[in-house]
């Protein structure tokens, strides 16, 4: 279903019932309002903030909408009389133009009473609902079956930053869209496929690299050493898997004595001649596990164009009231308006993997609603067992990729997307 197939259902005045998740309201406004049309945001005491936020966002959309009119119901979301009285003056003020009511966001009682209030005065109103399971805009009719319009990715592409903005969340900093040292990340993914090489990597990382570069506190690893102490370090590569050593060499990180030179890390540059790592400790963090996040980003980028993925990124840090750290999506992309969130960890520890997946699931549902999909990329040997243990979650909405999936991860992510499409049929 392309955008032109929505045209016959577009209106000049669209009443939207605002829910706790304003994303469906935003989608409905973008798909069903004519250029220069007017949104009417019908909200309760509990959804006042999302309504006011959506009013601001819609005013800045490229289709030149008129400023959204706010229609407060206060605490009367299930009171037929008050809903009718709130909507009636708005309807009476409309002299020209087609009218629509989209009741995706409201409670069932709100939807019923709003429908009756509008239908009694304007029976030719376009009544609609966004079905989150099937990704369809449904047009309800009194004289026939519901018309279903598939909201394909190319019909409406929602930026990740816009998705956060719709929920009143401002990113702490710009998210990453270019993978750091993707070839090194690929080499490490190859290493993790082999159990012996994985052990070899961890032996080198903990017993050689961390011993040189990291502080210890109560016999446990603490923060990285200071820049002045890290810069002069040359670290033995004797026990390192050859694939990783080759990538260090390709990036000119090996000194004449054949050791890893942390001084050379500062010379790494992007295509734009910007430093790959702001500080040496950022390279240390990369080896500590961030490499897998960058590997995931590269795999998403590899399949983006042919899968209608326009917006993707890494490290979405969001401040959250009442918390010190807020929350973070490791990786995410939107396909149309559907959010795909990916939690990433190099751990194989079952409980930690489950915790990361559960946290990502909750945040993704909060951001992307029922349409959101969530995956965990980790180093477990048993991804299917791990997924089965997450019985509380809707298994159609989650995926778990283990270490055997890493080498073919772009293909696995593509299959995940296709499965999401299949589930929406």
Model-derived regions: residue spans:
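Short glycine-rich phosphate-binding loop at a beta-alpha junction
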Residues: 98-104
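Trp/Phe/Arg-rich N-terminal binding region typifying the photolyase-homology
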Residues: 105-110
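Conserved beta3 VAIK motif of the Hanks protein kinase fold
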Residues: 342
């Amino acid at each position: 279903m392309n955008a032109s197939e929505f045209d016959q259902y577009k209106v000049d005045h669209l009443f939207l019932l605002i829910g706790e998740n304003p994303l469906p309201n935003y989608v409905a406004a973008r798909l069903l309002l004519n250029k220069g049309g007017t949104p009417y945001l019908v909200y309760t005491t509990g959804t006042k903030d999302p309504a006011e936020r959506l009013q601001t966002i819609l005013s800045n959309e490229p289709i030149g909408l008129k400023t959204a009119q706010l229609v407060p119901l206060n605490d009367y979301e299930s009171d037929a009389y008050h809903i009718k009285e709130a909507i009636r003056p708005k309807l009476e003020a409309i002299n020209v133009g087609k009218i629509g009511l989209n009741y995706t966001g409201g409670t069932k009682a709100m939807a019923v009473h709003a429908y009756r209030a509008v239908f009694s005065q304007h029976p030719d109103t376009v009544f609609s609902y966004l079905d989150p399971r099937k990704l369809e805009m449904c047009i309800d009719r009194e004289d026939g079956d519901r018309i279903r319009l598939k909201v394909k990715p190319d019909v409406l592409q929602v930026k990740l930053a816009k998705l956060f903005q719709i929920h009143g969340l401002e990113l702490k900093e710009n998210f990453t869209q270019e993978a750091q040292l993707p070839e090194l990340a690929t080499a490490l993914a190859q290493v993790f496929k082999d159990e012996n090489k994985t052990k070899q990597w961890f032996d080198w990382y903990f017993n050689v690299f961390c011993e040189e570069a990291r502080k210890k506190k109560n016999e446990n690893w603490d923060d990285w050493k200071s820049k002045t102490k890290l810069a002069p370090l040359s670290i033995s590569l004797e026990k390192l898997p050859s694939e990783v050593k080759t990538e260090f060499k390709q990036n000119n990180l090996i000194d004449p004595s054949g050791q890893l030179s942390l001084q050379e890390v500062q010379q790494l540059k992007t295509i734009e001649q910007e430093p790959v790592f702001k500080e040496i400790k950022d390279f240390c963090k990369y080896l500590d596990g961030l490499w897998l996040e960058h590997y995931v980003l590269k795999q998403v980028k590899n399949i983006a164009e042919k899968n209608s993925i326009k917006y993707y990124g890494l490290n979405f840090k969001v401040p959250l009231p009442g918390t010190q750290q807020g929350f973070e999506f490791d990786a995410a992309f939107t396909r149309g308006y559907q959010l795909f969130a990916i939690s990433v960890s190099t751990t194989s520890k079952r409980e930690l993997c489950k915790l990361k997946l559960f946290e990502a699931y909750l945040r993704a549902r909060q951001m992307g609603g029922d349409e959101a999909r969530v995956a965990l990329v980790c180093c477990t040997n048993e991804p299917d067992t791990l997924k089965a243990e997450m019985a509380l979650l809707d298994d159609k909405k989650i995926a778990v990729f283990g270490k055997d999936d890493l080498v073919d991860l772009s293909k696995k992510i593509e299959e995940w997307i296709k499965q999401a499409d299949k589930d929406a049929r």
